[in-house]
């Protein structure tokens, strides 16, 4: 049991980290992408360096919107040099859209761990922006309720959001997280599964699914979910080692 408790503790941070993960989500883009005036990404690298020093500076996002489209950032993320790829991942986090998800998911497998870390943050930011501006605002309020442990209020509000926006995957994920914290593991499993149906790239929901099965002592199902997690986001700290531990636990009851 001690080993299993440590296993759960290790991965709790990933799913809980979905509340306010990374920087505050940028607003949904409501304009046509502008042609880029910086094909090599030189301005992008400058903005990235400034972002590292001042991550909350609003003008950086505005500059990204002015000079780049999500499609151009995706190309730079795929073929740029090291610093350009890091910068492009940050840029997608700030202005990326639904079509950016595959590019960011690929970047989670980048040989540079900093690119992977930036892509992970960008994933959470893009997922929140997949709702309308109103839906994003409502979800941020739910996240705040979860943060202060007003869990019943969080469930009530996010359930209303799901009724009006049933295709908004991150709303399902946030309700799953809330159910998990309320120890309603079956309900959390159902919502994690729905999140993955809507967004098969959602490594947070895959990890949450594994944690729920662990709490219910359903070790084979937990292993399957963690194996999915590592396929989606292989650089999560200690994931491979913990999969090996869980495999051993299944073989030796």
Map each language-model feature to its residues:
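Extended repeat-based scaffolds of very large eukaryotic assembly and lipid-transport proteins
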Residues: 22-98, 102, 106-148
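Register position in tetratricopeptide repeats
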Residues: 94, 125-129, 147, 181, ...
């Amino acid at each position: 049991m001690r080993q299993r408790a440590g296993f759960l503790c290790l991965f709790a941070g990933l799913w809980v980290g979905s509340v306010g993960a990374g920087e505050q989500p940028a607003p949904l883009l409501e304009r046509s992408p502008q042609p880029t005036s910086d094909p090599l990404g030189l301005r992008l690298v400058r903005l990235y360096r400034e972002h590292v020093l001042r991550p909350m500076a609003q003008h950086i996002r505005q500059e990204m919107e002015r000079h780049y489209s999500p499609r151009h950032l995706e190309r730079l993320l795929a073929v740029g040099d090291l610093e350009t790829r890091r910068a492009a991942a940050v840029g997608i986090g700030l202005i990326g859209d639904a079509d950016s998800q595959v590019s960011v998911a690929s970047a989670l497998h980048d040989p540079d761990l900093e690119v992977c870390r930036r892509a992970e943050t960008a994933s959470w930011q893009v997922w929140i922006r997949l709702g309308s501006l109103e839906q994003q605002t409502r979800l941020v309020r739910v996240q705040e309720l979860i943060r202060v442990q007003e869990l019943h209020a969080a469930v009530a509000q996010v359930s209303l959001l799901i009724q009006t926006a049933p295709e908004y995957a991150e709303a399902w994920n946030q309700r799953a997280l809330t159910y998990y914290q309320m120890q309603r593991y079956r309900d959390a499993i159902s919502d994690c599964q729905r999140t993955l149906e809507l967004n098969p790239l959602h490594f947070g929901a895959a990890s949450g699914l594994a944690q729920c099965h662990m709490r219910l002592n359903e070790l084979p199902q937990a292993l399957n979910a963690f194996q999915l997690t590592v396929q989606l986001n292989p650089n999560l700290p200690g994931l491979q080692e913990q999969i090996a531990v869980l495999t051993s636990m299944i073989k030796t009851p």
